[in-house]
Amino acid sequence: RKNTTIKDSDILSDSKFFNAKDMIATTIPAINIALSGKINGGFVPGLTIWAGPSKHFKTSFSLLMAKAYMDKYQDAVMLFYDSEFGTPQSYFDSFGIDTSRVLHTPITDVEQLKFDIMHQFEEIKRGDHVIVVIDSVGNLASKKEVEDALKQNSAADMTRAKQLKSLFRMVTPHLNLKDIPLIVVNHTYQTQEMYSKAVVSGGTGIYYSADNIFILGRQQEKDGKDVTGYNFIINVEKSRFVKEKSKIPIEVSWDEGISKWSGLLDMALESGHVIKPKVGWFQKVDMETGEIGEKSYRMNDTYSFSFWHPILQCPKFNEFIEKKYAASNGAIMQEEDEVAAVYEMEDE
């Protein structure tokens, strides 16, 4: 260690970069599950991507995370890089975000974003509470593309993916060294296969750098013929904490926004904490005794703190959620005696 020229070098077991990081919980249990595989989990510093087509609530999920971070740290500030200008101040107000703690930076090309964000990161010290949101990189042009347009040059731009890869390659070390959460809104496109699938735009650089990539799908929520909101599905494309390809439902209504209790009913039905004795009715189950509660609930009656609090506090429900969604952190290599037993069986 004495010969290294890097000041932050340390014995691995003592390194501050491998200590447990603060986890920031959001107010929506299902979002916490998507981020960490735990009801009472949340997100840690690193790169999170919310990707999907237009009007898929990508910015809202990003601001929900930013709000949780700024509530946890009263001295926290947000750097908001804006290329789409579709997020007015009223949007921040609806999430209860103090806009006096938000630095709004308009951007027009990838290089402009890269230069400014790196300048900001060079000035940020470990221990500073800063969260960064980029909305978005999906339609952000490269500098060459802009210059070609001004010159009326219609040649294809081959630099954009390289510049995006360069951007995320440069910022990723800072996120981990300085404990900075970076939340990026991005677009998706459909592959041209027979059974097409959604792919995050921007090339491989985003995939390599991201800790979490969520691809959003949706379907309409109707009351009769009127559309009252959307049912979103968070598809876990990549995660360091959650099993990939997991699907977490989230409900959003025009009147009440994101439902705090989104997705929990399906999970509780699967775990056995709630049963559906007949169409449109639900009952809770005491998992210690196996007894079914006397009270029956309509769907709308399940959207309440009193209904969910006992279930969310139940260790068995938490264990079910973690087993279903959390990525395993068990030993990668087999124990020596297990390996020896395998060889002995082969020799017989």
Residue ranges and their predicted role:
Residues 92-93, 144-147, 194-196:
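Short acidic, glycine/serine/threonine-rich loops at helix termini
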Residues 1-13, 221-348:
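C-terminal regions of RecA-like/P-loop NTPase motor modules
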Residues 1-101, 118-122:
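The Walker A/P-loop phosphate-binding site
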Residues 157-271:
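Phosphate-binding/switch region of NTP-binding enzymes
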Residues 87, 140-141, 191-192:
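Catalytic P-loop NTPase motifs of RecA-like helicase/translocase cores
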Residues 95-102, 148-157, 199-203:
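A short alpha->loop->secondary-structure connector
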Residues 107-179:
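Phosphate-binding/switch loop-helix module in NTP-utilizing enzymes
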Residues 78, 131, 182:
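Hydrophobic "anchor" residues on beta-strands that sit immediately upstream
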